[in-house]
Amino acid sequence: MRADTVSVRADTVPVRTDRLMEVRPLAAMPLLILAATAAPQADWHIRNIRNRYFPYLRMHWDDYVQFAPLALSLSLPACGITPRWGNAYHYTAHSFAVGIALLGVLGTKYAVGRQRPQGNSHNSFPSGHTATAFLGAELLDLAYGERYPLLASFGYLTASLTAYGRILNNRHWGSDVLAGAAAGILSADAGYWLADLVWRQKRFAAFERTEMSAIVVDCSQGMERTFCGSQAWSSEVAVLKVTRGGEGGTFGWGGSIGTKLSERSETKPSYSINIVGEGGLDMGKRMNCGTLMSIGIGGIGATPLAEARLGGYVSFDLSAHRSWRLFFLIGRQLQANRDADLPLFIQTGIALRLRAFAW
């Protein structure tokens, strides 16, 4: 009797009932949609921005960082940190997930035969490095993210750095990276689903509750397009306190800093400091839909006072995963110089949500 009690305690984790829901099998769908539709149209713009600011950049750290989340997830049980559903189930799910990822990614690479940006081979789509990194990040999140949110944040941070490295090294197009991330996430979820079949137990849940009271570092990356046709790469880092606002959703507040790198050679990089507010709606306890509003001040190049600008935006996001969200943003910037061409702009992209603390 005592042995059974110990086994149950080690094999399960108490699940709170006051959390919003996430849809893991559907979480990768926006990435696949972007990779198939919007991203191919932006591939050349992303490459042009990369070639303008980092033309000679060559790094090799992404060859090693890609394995960090998977290696950590596999080694933690040996260090005495029990995964969410026990060691046997843990390694079964990982074995299936790795096998599915290998077959799926390698098969797609040679079936599609897309040429790399460097032109040296025809196995660009999808990115294998990115798939490996996001496979490990999702497995780490599934096994330990419930109890150790910092581990989940570490996994997705290193996976995102790997994706960045593949683009900065001119090894992949943007759509390759998005498809690789989706392949890794879906492979991890499929591995857990197959482990359920092997062990004849229902442990992997399609709809899973997630903490919505947290200190969140929100790192958004996306392509910006103005209505006059210019393209830019936008990056913003926001620190938010996100708290449940009741049964219907969440609210939050914080600050952010951002930068934009333009494709145009005559346009200087710009930056901004903003006050950010966030509100989210729980849509049928399946996924969250929210807005992110910002107002702030920024500058351009080396003369921020002469070219200071005030602006704001409203972002509409869809989040089916606790570690990242998809967003669509529309905004306007105002500037003292009335001759400046500052029309409305729109952005679309992905934001990584790193939970520093959760409760």
Residues covered by each model-derived region:
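Transmembrane beta-strand segments of Gram-negative outer membrane beta-barrel proteins
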Residues: 22-39, 208-226
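Outer-membrane beta-barrel "beta-signal"
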Residues: 211-213, 217, 235-237, 343-359
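Gram-negative (and chloroplast) outer-membrane scaffold detector with strong preference
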Residues: 80-85, 89-92, 111-115, 238-326, ...
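Hydrophobic alpha-helical bundle signature of multipass membrane enzymes
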Residues: 4-124, 130-166
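Outer-envelope beta-barrel architecture signal
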Residues: 150, 207-217, 231, 247-253, ...
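Sec-dependent signal peptide cleavage junction
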Residues: 1-21, 199-214, 358-359
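Alpha-helical transmembrane segments that form the membrane-embedded catalytic/substrate-binding core
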Residues: 126-136, 172-195
